[in-house]
């Protein structure tokens, strides 16, 4: 009985032709996919990228296409001006409260954008699709923001697709496609601030977040229904729809991140954490002279304040700016680098404060003078701080950043700020707390934990997923629950018969 499984793992995945379907929503998405492509090239595979360009927010000048990788960029032009300007609206909203209506509105806009973008891509120049078909791809790797990548892969005659997440969380709509059901009582929702708490109110909040994804926030589950209705009209009722393709062409899911940084949860073998992606260049760290001159100034150490590549700091409210500025003014013995896209009135008064439009953040994190990271709680910043053993002050703005802050707090390496309750004293207090020795000690312990794992080949999860995706018998390791409805999965059909029988007998 073990022979078929043994044969699967005897087969060696040599050079594969891999199609990467990239959701070019943000600079962060593109950067992540470039790192993934670079890793695949390092493993000896041929990679071609299909990148959808939308909302005019990708080219910051910091991303470079990996050597040996080709990319086709398909422009998306929305008919609605509001959707074209969607990034600007979203970037201003993330500094605000984000009430229920804002979250619902964002979900509706995002849903319409995904369906329209999918239609444009599927109706794109047929000669381009023919060129992709000639490449004879073995497998596609795509982000699960919607189901359209399955349609694109099918049109290019790609038989297998690996889902990959952009963040380190599994949303309910992606988990269900792989036969995994989330348990709200024990598994924190990616958008919930409850974290790992199992108190009654926290479990209520967690459950409501899970239920809300039907028609809410930035990834509503009914998006998949609307997209599938369009696809059925596009290909005809006699063809497999997107739900069918999800069940027959997707054998595995990669979660972007390190398992140690997530909350514990049971996962089947075809769902795995990717670990760090990207190839270390092995070069000595060399800073640009202007940056090195700033860092090497005599001080108690370096503090970096950066809110990532998605948020536009020109939209930062005055209250937020003044709170941080005032707090930095009290930290005169530290050198502070503030990644900011506009000038800040009053910043010139502080010799220790330096405003810059861009930073090599990953390199700076490993500089010996680095003491503290102030960030929004994006996964990349969280991962970089954890790997470098640097404590953090996190101020979540949107999406999964609240849960990332909870992850960091769980290890005792971070303090957290509420973006709606900022004062000079609040910010200063959070920074001074995080600068205490115990936070640095905890951060270094976490860094050691990330390094001290079971010995394995580099990029083993990625290698393993490629093996599963190209296996001739994916049914050996995928879950049967992938093909069950909600009623069947929870045995509600059986319970209903039992209850009905009991009711008839008793009454």
From Swiss-Prot:
Keywords: Glycoprotein, Glycosyltransferase, Membrane, Signal, Transferase, Transmembrane, Transmembrane helix
EC numbers for this chain: 2.4.1.17
Single GO MF annotation: UDP-glycosyltransferase activity
Transmembrane segments: 379-399
Subcellular location: Membrane
Broad enzyme group: transferase
Catalysis performed (reactions): glucuronate acceptor + UDP-alpha-D-glucuronate = acceptor beta-D-glucuronoside + UDP + H(+)
Glycan-linked positions: 312
The keyword Transmembrane belongs to this UniProt entry's keyword annotation: yes
PROSITE patterns documented for this protein: UDPGT (PS00375)
Superkingdom, natural source: Eukaryota
Topology versus the membrane: Single-pass membrane protein
PANTHER family: EG:EG0003.4 PROTEIN-RELATED, UDP-GLUCURONOSYLTRANSFERASE UGT-60-RELATED
Entry similarity comment: Belongs to the UDP-glycosyltransferase family.
Protein name per the record: Putative UDP-glucuronosyltransferase ugt-60
Organism: Caenorhabditis elegans
């Amino acid at each position: 009985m073990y022979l078929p499984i043994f044969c699967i793992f005897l087969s060696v995945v040599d050079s594969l032709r891999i199609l990467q379907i990239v959701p070019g929503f943000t600079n962060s998405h593109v950067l992540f996919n470039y790192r993934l492509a670079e890793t695949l090239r390092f493993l000896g595979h041929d990679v071609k990228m299909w990148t959808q360009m939308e909302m005019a927010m990708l080219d910051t000048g910091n991303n470079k296409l990996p050597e040996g990788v080709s990319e086709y960029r398909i422009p998306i032009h929305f008919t609605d001006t509001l959707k074209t300007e969607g990034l600007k609206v979203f970037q201003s909203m993330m500094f605000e409260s984000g009430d229920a209506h804002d979250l619902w509105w964002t979900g509706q806009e995002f849903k319409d954008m995904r369906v329209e973008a999918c239609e444009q891509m599927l109706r794109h120049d047929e000669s381009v699709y023919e060129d992709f078909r000639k490449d004879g791809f073995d497998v596609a790797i795509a982000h699960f923001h919607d189901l359209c990548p399955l349609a694109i892969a099918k049109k290019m005659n790609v038989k297998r697709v690996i889902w990959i997440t952009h963040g380190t969380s599994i949303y309910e709509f992606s988990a269900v496609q792989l036969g995994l059901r989330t348990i709200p009582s024990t598994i924190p929702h990616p958008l919930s601030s409850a974290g790992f708490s199992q108190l009654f109110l926290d479990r209520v909040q967690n459950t409501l977040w899970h239920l809300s994804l039907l028609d809410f926030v930035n990834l509503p589950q009914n998006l998949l229904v609307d997209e599938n209705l369009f696809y059925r009209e596009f290909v005809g009722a006699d063809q497999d729809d997107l739900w069918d393709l999800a069940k027959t062409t997707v054998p595995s899911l990669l979660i972007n991140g390190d398992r140690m940084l997530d909350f514990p949860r049971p996962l089947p073998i075809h769902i795995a954490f990717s670990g760090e992606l990207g190839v270390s260049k092995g070069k000595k760290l060399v800073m640009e002279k202007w940056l090195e001159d700033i860092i090497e100034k005599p001080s108690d150490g370096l503090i970096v304040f950066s809110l990532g590549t998605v948020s536009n700091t020109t939209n930062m409210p005055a209250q937020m700016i003044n709170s941080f500025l005032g707090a930095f003014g009290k930290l005169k013995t530290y050198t502070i680098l503030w990644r900011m896209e506009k000038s800040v009135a009053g910043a010139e008064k502080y010799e220790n404060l330096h405003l810059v439009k861009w930073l090599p953040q990953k390199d700076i994190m490993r500089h010996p003078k680095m003491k503290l990271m102030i960030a929004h709680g994006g996964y990349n910043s969280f991962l970089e701080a954890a790997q470098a053993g640097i404590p953090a002050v996190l101020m979540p703005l949107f999406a999964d950043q609240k849960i990332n802050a909870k992850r960091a707090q769980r290890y005792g390496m971070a303090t957290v700020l509420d973006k709606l309750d900022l004062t000079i004293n609040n910010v200063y207090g959070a920074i001074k707390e995080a600068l205490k020795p115990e936070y640095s000690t905890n951060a270094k312990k976490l860094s050691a934990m990330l390094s001290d794992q079971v010995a394995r080949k580099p990029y083993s999860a990625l290698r393993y997923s490629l093996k599963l995706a190209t296996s001739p018998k994916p049914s050996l390791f995928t879950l049967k629950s992938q093909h069950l409805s909600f009623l069947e999965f929870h045995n509600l059909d059986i319970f209903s018969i039992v209850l009905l029988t009991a009711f008839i007998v008793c009454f």
